[in-house]
């Protein structure tokens, strides 16, 4: 082969290959010099390669260069990666080990090949470049840098394979093991199958697995005791406060005269907290009174966390990293140390507390006429619970303390709530019919019961007060051009709207192509009393976009507000703390502590920490439900079809509030097709159909703890489209007379069968000698044959006469 090129790597290529092809350096230089993308054929022609082996070798080299992030392939053309932008992204890996890089600030993903996934864990932050677009139009990427490792420690079971020890993470999204030295195993005195906690020493590369060392053996712990710390580590949640952070938090004392300077004193006001029975940190207190000229005054006092968490201090850095408190089923991972979250920042009863206040005036009709924000000092008059207040509003005067001012305020709050409830309906804020649950636990952290949680009037009263303050804060920031993070909830995407519209039309309800909150709420109202309301509302909910934090106001679609933010929970949400700082800075005529690009980055970060917390909490809840259902394998329950897909039905059990799946193969002897419009699985042969809201009886077939999946088997469909389905008795044929032959056959079948003798042989029956046919029998046979022939001749003649007569009649008609 004649070479028509000068290769800077020619010597190295010649040492490695008998028949060298252009090196990677030469290929990149050639594409760069041509200043345009080149195909494989273009390069073959340029280098004048003629033999088939070298042509194929060049093709393999180009593919390898794409794989290694040196070239980008677009269709059949190759171009330099330097022309491709670098994106910040987060790694997401599913339970099958397939992964994508989700690009920041975009609704786009890049698929990652197995080689790229070797060097990352689920949740890692990376920089990626696009390398190719496949035939389905999906982008593939290359990891140029891992910028942040989410997982630093992990809990899993010790395993061994061919003398090599490793820990296999239990999280279904953890796709690769962490290797351990045999000496470390022996020193820690752990054995295969034990749960252990490991710290990662060397993170994985494209060529090697991660390595680590054992921190703690957890072999003596029950699985239910391990699941929360295991999840905390797997999601990279900060779980231990550093010593300097604890020291910072504990350095503050009870509010003194100096702390109260420049604050409005509200200690004589009958402010109270209203929270759940198990609440320990109290962010907010409320008070209401009727104004002399008509209307209402509402005071919403929020813990002044910004007084204690100072910018750039260790305490602030730790809170910023956490972003939010994480609420597991029976454990809270707080954003702030306990000295603040349950102490100085918590609006505990009968002690002075520093707060930020939203003081509002409302008209008789509930419209906000004015508001102001200011720092204050308060003294809570009572720690009330939702249950106490609800019972008091229902007529139990002993449910809350005998404090006249407190009772008067609670009564006024309830009157105002009745007014605000009407305004909520007028603006068409969405109120979905969903069932919230809570769990009770045993001593080892396992579920004892799953029970429905009811929202009473006290819950809704406090919710309306918080909405008033949050909306006022958003309007205040807009009016005064204060840089801050809005809570943004955008309208649904068109593709999601189409799915909802097709489904809602089948319910006989109108739904436009560009729906407003009014259109959504109309469907909610029209279906709220139906038995399948939760399933219908779940379809509407799934069409909603995910809310996020951002510096640009885009309104809140779900709540039907033009502007909205979070002001009321700074103990557990860092964005609320940022807003308090921004309002304080404005009141003091100082520049805002955060603005521009830094504010945008903050919005991205806190949206991510919120999602991380939600995913971690959901993962634990799902695991605990799976663990709980292990004791019910083989039992039958009644459930409601809550979602449908091509591969089966998702069913929520009525009594246990647990979700599982009935695979399409378990639905019966039919071929089922998924109908997107009606959200149904329809049998093509027998017409049986399964839709949202259908009631079914299932049997718990199996539980997979690692994958967090519960499998059901269908026992019986109990209802469809709101109508009960009665069990049908099997069809029975009508009785007919029994023939002689059947009688004799039955008698023959009922005769005792021959049994074996003691020797094991069956007795042999002697055959009767054959008897020759008599003359009589021969005559009878002959006669029947003759008779049969005569009968055939008669039938033929009769048929001929009938045809002749028909022909004559036809002729008469024509004439």
Model-derived features: where do they sit?
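A generic structural signal for residues embedded in beta-strands
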Residues: 128, 198, 644, 698-700
């Amino acid at each position: 082969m004649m070479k028509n090129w000068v290769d800077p790597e020619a010597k190295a290529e010649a040492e490695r290959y008998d028949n060298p092809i252009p090196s990677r350096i030469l290929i990149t230089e050639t594409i760069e010099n041509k200043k345009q993308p080149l195909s494989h054929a273009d390069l073959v022609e340029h280098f004048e390669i003629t033999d088939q082996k070298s042509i194929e070798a060049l093709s393999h080299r180009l593919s390898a260069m794409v794989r290694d992030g040196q070239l980008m392939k677009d269709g059949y053309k190759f171009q330099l990666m330097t022309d491709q932008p670098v994106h910040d992204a987060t790694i997401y890996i599913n339970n099958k080990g397939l992964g994508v890089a989700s690009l920041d600030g975009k609704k786009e993903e890049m698929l990652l090949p197995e080689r790229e996934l070797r060097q990352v864990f689920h949740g890692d932050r990376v920089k990626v470049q696009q390398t190719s677009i496949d035939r389905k139009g999906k982008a593939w990427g290359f990891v140029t840098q891992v910028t942040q490792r989410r997982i630093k420690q992990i809990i899993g079971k010790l395993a061994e394979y061919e003398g090599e020890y490793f820990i296999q993470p239990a999280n279904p999204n953890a796709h690769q093991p962490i290797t351990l030295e045999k000496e470390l195993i022996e020193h820690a005195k752990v054995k295969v199958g034990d749960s252990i906690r490991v710290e990662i020493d060397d993170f994985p590369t494209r060529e090697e697995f991660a390595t680590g060392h054992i921190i703690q053996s957890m072999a003596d712990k029950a699985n239910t005791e391990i699941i929360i710390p295991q999840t905390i580590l797997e999601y990279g949640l900060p779980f231990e406060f550093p010593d300097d952070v604890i020291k910072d938090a504990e350095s503050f004392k009870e509010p003194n005269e100096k702390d109260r300077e420049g604050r409005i004193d509200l200690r004589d006001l009958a402010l109270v907290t209203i929270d759940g029975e198990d609440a320990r940190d109290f962010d907010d207190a409320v008070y209401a009174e009727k104004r002399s000229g008509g209307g209402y005054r509402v005071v919403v006092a929020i813990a002044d966390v910004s007084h204690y968490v100072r910018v750039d201090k260790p305490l602030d850095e730790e809170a910023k990293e956490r972003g939010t408190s994480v609420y597991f089923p029976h454990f809270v991972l707080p954003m702030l140390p306990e000295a603040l979250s349950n102490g100085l920042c918590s609006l505990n009863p009968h002690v002075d507390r520093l707060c930020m206040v939203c003081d509002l005036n409302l008209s008789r009709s509930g419209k906000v006429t004015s508001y102001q924000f200011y720092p204050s000092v308060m003294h809570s008059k009572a720690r009330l619970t939702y249950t106490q207040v609800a019972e008091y509003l229902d007529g139990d005067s002993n449910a809350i303390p005998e404090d006249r001012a407190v009772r008067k305020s609670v009564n006024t709050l309830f009157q105002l709530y009745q007014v605000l409830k009407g305004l909520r309906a007028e603006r068409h804020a969405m109120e979905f019919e969903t069932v919230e649950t809570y769990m009770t636990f045993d001593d080892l952290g396992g579920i004892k019961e799953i029970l429905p949680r009811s929202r009473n009037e006290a819950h809704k009263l406090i919710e309306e007060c918080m909405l008033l303050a949050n909306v006022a804060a958003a309007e205040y920031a807009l009016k005064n051009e204060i840089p801050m993070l809005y809570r943004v909830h955008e309208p649904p995407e068109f593709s999601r709207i189409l799915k909802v519209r097709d489904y809602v039309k089948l319910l006989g309800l109108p739904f436009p192509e560009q729906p407003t909150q009014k259109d959504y709420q109309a469907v909610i109202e029209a279906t709220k009393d139906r038995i399948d309301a939760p399933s219908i509302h779940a379809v509407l909910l799934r069409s909603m976009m995910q809310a996020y934090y951002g510096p640009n106001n885009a309104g809140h679609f779900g709540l039907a507000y033009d502007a909205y933010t979070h002001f009321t929970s700074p103990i557990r949400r860092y964005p609320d703390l940022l807003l308090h700082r921004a309002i304080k800075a404005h009141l003091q005529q100082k520049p805002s502590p955060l603005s521009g690009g830094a504010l945008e980055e903050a919005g991205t970060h806190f949206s991510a920490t919120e999602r991380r917390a939600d995913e971690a909490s959901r993962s634990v809840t799902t695991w605990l439900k799976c663990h709980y259902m292990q004791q019910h394998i083989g039992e039958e329950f009644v459930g409601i079809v809550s979602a449908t897909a091509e591969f089966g039905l998702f069913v929520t059990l009525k009594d246990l509030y647990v979700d599982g799946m009935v695979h399409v193969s378990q639905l019966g002897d039919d071929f089922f097709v998924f109908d997107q419009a009606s959200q149904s699985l329809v049998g093509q042969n027998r017409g049986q159909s399964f839709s949202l809201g259908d009631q079914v009886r299932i049997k718990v077939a199996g539980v997979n703890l690692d994958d967090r999946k519960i499998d059901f088997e269908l026992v019986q469909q109990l209802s469809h489209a709101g109508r009960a389905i009665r069990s049908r008795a099997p069809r029975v044929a009508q009785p007919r007379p029994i023939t002689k032959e059947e009688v004799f056959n039955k008698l023959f079948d009922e005769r005792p069968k021959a049994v074996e003798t003691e020797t094991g042989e069956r007795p042999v029956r002697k055959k009767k000698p054959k008897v020759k046919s008599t003359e009589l029998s021969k005559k009878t046979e002959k006669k029947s044959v003759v008779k049969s022939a005569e009968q055939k001749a008669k039938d033929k003649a009769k048929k001929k006469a009938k045809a002749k007569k028909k022909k004559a009649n036809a002729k008469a008609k024509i004439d």
